[in-house]
Amino acid sequence: MASISTPFPISLHPKTVRSKPLKFRVLTRPIKASGSETPDLTVATRTGSKDLPIRNIPGNYGLPIVGPIKDRWDYFYDQGAEEFFKSRIRKYNSTVYRVNMPPGAFIAENPQVVALLDGKSFPVLFDVDKVEKKDLFTGTYMPSTELTGGYRILSYLDPSEPKHEKLKNLLFFLLKSSRNRIFPEFQATYSELFDSLEKELSLKGKADFGGSSDGTAFNFLARAFYGTNPADTKLKADAPGLITKWVLFNLHPLLSIGLPRVIEEPLIHTFSLPPALVKSDYQRLYEFFLESAGEILVEADKLGISREEATHNLLFATCFNTWGGMKILFPNMVKRIGRAGHQVHNRLAEEIRSVIKSNGGELTMGAIEKMELTKSVVYECLRFEPPVTAQYGRAKKDLVIESHDAAFKVKAGEMLYGYQPLATRDPKIFDRADEFVPERFVGEEGEKLLRHVLWSNGPETETPTVGNKQCAGKDFVVLVARLFVIEIFRRYDSFDIEVGTSPLGSSVNFSSLRKASF
């Protein structure tokens, strides 16, 4: 398939890591098993050269209905996601095992998966030669297409499907066409955000980052991608509320919203919520994108995509993928950097301000590339707490999948699942894997670890193409995350936070913001 180069003029990745030019998104090539006893199988992943013993996949699915419900209760209520997986790793002495994934009965037809919970087995989920991605974006169930205008959106398409290439190229065009607006619009919108947070902090003694940030993120995306200020349209400031409600209707089987189990289980985990309840909200969003995306819709015409289908895909990519990702990522970044302490804050502030000063007071892509600690901190945030925790793929053929300690036979048609935080905090790959280490990716040795940063549905050292499922906006997300850190430490020497929980990401309040003193 054809590929397209990154829409950004300067690579976001160290040159020492990649020898080939940027394309976009990850592909791992199939390696044939050399053992004569398994000539019909493909080795899904292989690191090192030692022969690993073939082991039966441990675990079980329990009784129909009862087993999936028990696993769902463990996942949401009795253990929580991380302990759910870790306890079974201890039980089976294996990072590969069989388990049921939510939502199970009665929303998902088949909740049974083979879980891949280490950094060696996990990457098979990116290899579209080995796994199919059709209708697996949300896992073992797919929300009704009534929530997306009757269309299967790009995120649910396998690269083998004809529309995948056209729709992904449309997103590449969107990114390319917006590149000159990203820097000025980010600085304008996030300067307004921090001005308002300072006022709130002075009045109340603390400032809620999440609520204010949601509106800022949408304003930035609308202005950067489409050249439209939502305040000047019928949408006004309503987008975050409309999107949050719509996302809830898409993802409610996978969320816990803090209600008692006896209420939450029948309400959001047992049956799908009726799409009709958000139809009018979605229509308001659709009309905004239809009216704002003129240049992009002209490109859709050229690609042979109807304007209606293109608009639904632009809405999903902007609101679900990008805004939703920023809603999770930015509060998590504030949390992790806040907890790193004032010494780290001072180092970031010194690096950012000195680089900008030496660049004549101007922030450019070239200047950002010189901010080694800033870049490392962003990658560490993405490693430690990836905004997307789950990846799914259905085996296209019989496979042998290797963990660090054993190899496992998987049959064609079996569902594979990976919980990304365990893969990117694999202690056999990362030293101090469960610690946030700001300088982890600084220097040549640090750069070599970037291939194990997997948040984008592929290694950080790879790039998206129309032939894979790596996030089309991977480089965009890394860029805006860097801009976010830069904006904070251009303005402040340090800050303090209070952290709570949220169904999507973290709830963060600023308890202090110390303005720049040098």
UniProtKB/Swiss-Prot annotation:
(13S)-hydroperoxy-(9Z,11E,15Z)-octadecatrienoate binds at N321, T389. Pfam families: p450 (PF00067). The keyword Transcription regulation does not apply. It catalyses: (13S)-hydroperoxy-(9Z,11E,15Z)-octadecatrienoate = (9Z,13S,15Z)-12,13-epoxyoctadeca-9,11,15-trienoate + H2O; (13S)-hydroperoxy-(9Z,11E)-octadecadienoate = (9Z,13S)-12,13-epoxyoctadeca-9,11-dienoate + H2O. One of its GO terms (biological process) is defense response. Residues 1-33 form a transit peptide. Its EC number is 4.2.1.92. Keywords: Chloroplast, Fatty acid biosynthesis, Fatty acid metabolism, Heme, Iron, Lipid biosynthesis, Lipid metabolism, Lyase, Metal-binding, Oxylipin biosynthesis, Plastid, Transit peptide. Changing S155A: Confers strong HPL activity. This is Allene oxide synthase, chloroplastic.
